[in-house]
């Protein structure tokens, strides 16, 4: 929920070239009033793998990866030209070598450390999985592939002290696990108790948010109970540990408030953000067969329960385990399709997700009907 916004926040907070804007960007916030010693101390390289252009062969992916990821390194040097002087790249066109050049220069000239941000690190590898292109996925994540080489450069930079942190966002820990020794220093924060509430809005935060919206865009607090019940039914219910707090989905709640404000306080006709709908291909790919998909959806749509093994609630797992039938509940949980009801059962968190699942259910039945 809001992964890219978090990346933007970190970029602005740690970028040394934005120190003059710290008060403007963060002055009225908690982190602005309680700054750490590290704010605005680093050189930022920000990657976004979601813009990766796909290809059906490894050479094409490698070229597209370099085309996309040389730019962020060049931008960092341009923004910090006061430190890089007359530095010029000698390996333009190769994202890993350009990053390595910058890190070597920074270390040898005792420059501030580099802070690397990678948004949607697994976007294009997940696309390979949903397209059933497992052989190409294996090529990308094994041996000396361009992706493993890239993360090896980052690992080396962290070890040598030229990189302060590499913070990645993504959907699944599968790719990170399958990279194995290429990047075996990653720490998965998703299920850490201190970070859970970053994944959504608490009840207290949502109440504050709603009261603000009502005051500014509606008739005032007289509608609080009405709207509160609506958003609890549709956007609440996410729990990321069995004993964790229930959270609102920040993305779809904000979608509702934006529509509510644009309609001058009228409840929008469409309560479901279309961006919430995970592609039906994920369901088909995950379950491997139509029968498996229907069995799984029956359990969720009809019973609203899918048993899971709490021991499987791990922060890392590989591709083989992700597609294991016994692991479906955890796989769906990581895809954001279900949430934890307790230590034994996953469930649909709210009416919005039930609506989405009903659409999946109907699509699969239609697929079956057409096949017959």
What function would you assign to each model-found segment?
Residues 3:
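Conserved lysine of the Walker
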Residues 6:
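Hydrophobic positions on the alpha1 helix immediately C-terminal to the Walker A/P-loop
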Residues 12-78:
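P-loop NTPase motor core
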Residues 46, 115-119, 148-152, 163-171:
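Structural recognition of the conserved hydrophobic beta-strand(s) that form the central parallel beta-sheet
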Residues 101-109, 136-164:
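Substrate-engagement module of ASCE P-loop NTPases
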Residues 110-140:
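Conserved P-loop NTPase "ATPase switch" module shared by AAA+ and STAND
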Residues 175-181, 189-259:
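Amphipathic alpha-helical segments of the small helical/lid subdomains adjacent to P-loop NTPase cores
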Residues 186-187, 246-372:
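Extended alpha-helical interface modules used as scaffolds for assembling large macromolecular complexes
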